[in-house]
Amino acid sequence: MQLGMIGLGRMGADMVRRLTKGAQQCVVYDVQPAAVERLAQEGVTGASSLEDLVARLDKPRAVWLMVPAAVVDGTLEKLVPLLEPGDIVIDGGNSYYHDDIRRGADLAARKLHYVDVGTSGGVAGRERGYCLMIGGETQVVERLEPIFSTLAPGAAAAPATSGRNPGSSTAEQGFLHCGPLGAGHFVKMVHNGIEYGLMAAYAEGLNILRHADAGKHAREADAETSPLRRPQLYQYDFNLADIAEVWRRGSVIGSWLLDLIAGTLAGDADLQQYAGRVSDSGEGRWTMSAAIDEGVPAPVLSAVLFARFSSRGEADFANRVLSAMRHDFGGHAEKPAAPPASSQG
């Protein structure tokens, strides 16, 4: 099948490579000509403009957008006038499902089809395959199945689920038509909210292990410091790289995320290349908005989202307010920041 790909960033380019390896034909475009040229040197058909890309595609066309959510509308403003009835636009980025519904209605008025695809797999997807969560019209999604099946990991990516009827759904292949327009990005939104929680649990657990030698370090004994009452219980120097490694092997908390952090800790036990400012790209906020609208409790997901805000310094003023109040009502002096802990073991 032929596909136009707009956006050749860290995922888009590798998706094209996986599609090409799987015998699908791609025509590619990016606002950065160098990104197009790199794939052209690998034998992929490059386009010099959106007009050129559309002209090179057979009708009815299928065009996949792999661009940041913030630029989807701007890209569509330029792309849609070039398309014809029956053409398909696929948004494979992390758009808000509300926007999918709006955009789909706008395109339907022009007799164009819109499909939303939540794409998970990151930079490893080229080899591992991509988990695809899809929303849109059934017949349109079925038309695109050669693309989805090529991008997806396939049934061999995970053991068969006990009690499940084999072949009952494309979910076993790593792609799923989740429902009508917006459903794909809704499922991906919640997926990313869960991802936030998993990442935070690993981070907090490893941090507790890192500070398990607290009993070896003297603390000031005054009214401003909560004493460590039994320092003899905190005398451990843990090798976090080794702990992450042993957890990978047969542990109930084993996962790809753990594989990644184990590899990082093996090369940089102190994680010195990271400042600890954790971004959030929108999906966590949208997940919480959905939970509030649905009246569904999600305390873990809300806590980890707020923790990301705090990591970027957004809590600094609030903390200064707290410190000022303690000083004003009780004369409590503010303690200087503790030096960063060094690596263990």
Where are these regions (language model features)?
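Beta-loop-alpha module in the N-terminal Rossmann-like domain of NAD(P)-dependent dehydrogenases
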Residues: 63-78, 96-99
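Short glycine-/small-residue-rich Rossmann-like dinucleotide-binding loops
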Residues: 67-69, 94, 119, 152
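NAD(P)+-binding Rossmann beta1-loop-alpha1 motif at the extreme N-terminus of oxidoreductases
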Residues: 1-62, 86, 123-126, 327
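Rossmann-fold NAD(P)-binding glycine/threonine-rich loop
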Residues: 85-88, 92-142
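General beta-strand structural signal in soluble alpha/beta enzymes
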Residues: 47-48, 91, 109, 113-117, ...
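Helical "substrate-binding/catalytic lid" subdomain
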Residues: 133, 143, 155-332
